[in-house]
Amino acid sequence: TLVGPIGSGQVSKLANQIVVGVTIGAVAEAITLCEKAGADPVKLIKALSGGWADSKILQTHGKRMIDKDFTPKGKTSTHLKDMNNILECANSYNTHLPISNLVKEMYKTLVDNGHGNTDHSSLYNEIERINKK
């Protein structure tokens, strides 16, 4: 799909990775909150299915988070690279993306702690780590 002049395809790929990374973070937080409150995250995903919060990420990565299965499909280290590219691109347009920056920092922490080869849904583990403080 043509989205604009030359270079727009690259920016679109970066935009896709913003949505993926931020949504993985949102799903991780939702599952963590449910678990902490004693709610069943499997039932949460079922309840959200078909509504505004439903997405492939909720269904696929949510299940991985619940199952604690972080076998890499999309690596954390690759998503960190993408987030760095996103922020570099944004900076070149004098554009601030604070949510993307937060997601990047969380992926960086995972990579720095030796989890670069896990699936990017392992962002859930960083949310869990933060909540064990």
Describe each region flagged by the PLM.
Residues S8-E126, I130-N131:
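Helical "substrate-binding/catalytic lid" subdomain
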